[in-house]
């Protein structure tokens, strides 16, 4: 690795850590409690955010929770007592909002992971986890990268990558909190991992 690439890696790690440090602890705990208290959890996201949501669904399954990915054929219907967790980093996405509306009408609660807590989708949600990171909507494509999106600087990472990397870290932190809430162990989680690989 060149010195320039190593410097970019350090900058990216600082940015991701900065996002995690700015999480609202109370909102994080409410989000964890909502997940642990749900009868069934359905998860949805688009693009690379969708990949993070699939990884999170897998970890929730490892915790023994009834977690499913929206769009998969094995997804049961949602209703009262269930939770739809959606990712909408840039804010209002029409397809995500439509799914949230369907879930709400069926009696399920809606939880939103976003960088835009003031969006209509977030305002209508039962739970919001604000990840304060650059998304595609914030990326101005500048070449002079900075580490603080609050000052209008562009992340060293392209497009929405800062949000996506921070999202994965936040989800793993939620898994650790949920492990405490559910009384699961590393061993019990490993025991639920597939043997077909």
Language-model segment annotations:
Residues 42-168:
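Glycine-rich phosphate-binding loops that contact phosphosugars or nucleotide phosphates
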Residues 1-21:
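Generic N-terminal amphipathic, Lys/Arg-enriched alpha-helix
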Residues 1, 173, 179-197:
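A short, charged, Gly/Pro-tolerant segment at domain boundaries
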